Amino acid sequence: MAKYLVIVESPAKVKTVKKFLGSNYEVAASNGHVRDLPKSQMGIDIENDFEPKYITIRGKGELLAGLRKAAKKADKVYLATDPDREGEAISWHLSKALNLDEKKMRRITFNEITKGAVKESIKHARDIDMNLVDEQQARRVLDRMVGYKISPLLWQKIKRGLSAGRVQSVALRIIGDREDEINAFIPEEYWTLDAVFKIPGEKKPLTAKFYGKEKEKMHIASKEELDRILKELDGVSYQVKDVKKGERTRKAPLPFTTSTLQQEAAKTLNFSTQKTMRLAQQLYEGVDIKGNGTVGLISYLRTDSTRISEEADTLARNFIQEQYGEQYAAKGEEKKAEKKNVQDAHEAIRPTDVTRLPALIKESLSRDQFRLYQLIWKRFVASRMKPAVYETTSVKIAGGEYIFTVSASKLIFDGFMSVYTQEDEEKTQNNLLVKGLDEHTELKLQDFDSQQHFTQPPAHYTEASLVKTLEELGIGRPSTYAPTITTIIARRYVAKEQKNLYMTELGEVVNNMMKKAFPSIVDVNFTATMEDLLDKVGDGTVDWKVVVRNFYPDLDEAVKAAEKDLEEVKLEDEVTDVICENCGRNMVIKYGPHGRFLACPGFPECRNTKPYLEKIGVPCPKCGKEVVLKKTKKGRKYYGCEDNPDCDFMSWQKPLKEKCPQCGGYMVEKGNKKVCADEHCGYVAMKKEEE
């Protein structure tokens, strides 16, 4: 009979952990949380100092009965849930649900599921950390209060099925603010000027970029300014004024945190944050490897630390020396990143065994598991390697009073780049390294190459860039990035198209209402400050009840004011003059996942539907028919011709009736300005108030 009971979170871990412990140990799984707040009510006793009313999660009764039985037989119960605040809370809930005797109950954690880590955790068994439990309780209670107080208001004022959240609503606002920036952006013209020179003794010409004057970098804002510069350069001689040679290094990247793994997997593997976390969980919990059984392949996946244990660091450097040569292994330099809100409770994400090369286990992994493991392995190995070294040359070329410059670089030692290069890895420029050039060398001008450009608006957020922004602003924590993004997409507040995130019409309505009624809830600084407070609960310096007590009155007051003052936003059925061709009824406007559409009110007898074409009172610039507001399949708004597909007119900005006085083309609305749709024209005017 087993003397000891070890309870882990997932059944997948049972198999991995069991093989490291002898027959004296029974390993069982809780299948995640066993107690939670009830779904049917807020579940917080406001009058009793915000005491949570926990209940057993439906369907967990039989599992808990089995665990109770096993716990009674065991001499000692080890609670081995995940090594974070969520895992700490699950252990605490288990202790309550199983009525565990404190004398025979111990908490163990391991950052990786390996034999050494599991056995070591038992040697260092401890009590449950109630500070971490209280932090999780505070987060759960705050999230529940926001959700249960505000969501019904959204149902009442907009439509049923909507939700608000302490972190998700801020993320939605961040996306909305970026869309406002993009919509209000006015492109500005600028020009670049390159000079192409013949180098003495070289067949390949040299291209240099216009810099300006010796002590003044110049920006060429117009064709007129370009023509003036070209006129002043007419007939001048060109001479090399300065040649500087040197070296520069490119440092190895730090090993992955949760955030940087999500960002890099999104950029290089095209994985959503949710997919990355699901695969990383599988790699952490254990995968069946041929000849080795179930093996945990990576360390714990929810971390904001770039720290690596001394043992793992030494093993990695030894591996690098053996496989790549001593010159590639870094010499123990400290690799630290100054980042906001780093808890440093865990190591960075790394392989559990650096000698387990991706190629050796490829056959045992799914394609996506392999790709993610390979990314983590390469990044970790690279982080323990020396920087890449480039030989550089910078040249200044004088022509009259103007300066042209050229910079070149050549990789002379690949360092960490022998293992790992990022998507945006800089490319070697002018690989000639500008040979044969010395100061005072006379150069012959072959040609000028001038190009017109326009400044670009800020980019739409992607999952990767949103995670980066949330982390930089201190919004959310490693465990919340993926579920936050998943929720706002699932709620149809945000649409994802070709990696970009766009606010839907529904998202705009919800975001505007949240900003108006609950400005502090969606305020970035307020939310970041709250996150810091919650972290302090976790380290024992702030009482969680104090945080909740201070938060609730303002929330309650704002909800009451919104119930009274906020107007309803009608997204319900609206009768139109469009006749259903099947039954003759007037069709109504319905609101679906992708926005509005026309439906027959005779449903279910008549199931006729068609796209809703909202006319904006502007003739199509191409064919003269009506321009209508449309939606992409994902819910992003655009303007197109009602005669599509026969007419392919399309604009992301709202077209205006007024013609451009400068070129005669059509104008579009951008914030409070009227802008010519032809960026080469560049006409901009302020809208009048009556417009």
What are these regions (language model features)?
Residues 260-273, 467-477:
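Short helix-coil junctions and helix-kink-helix linkers
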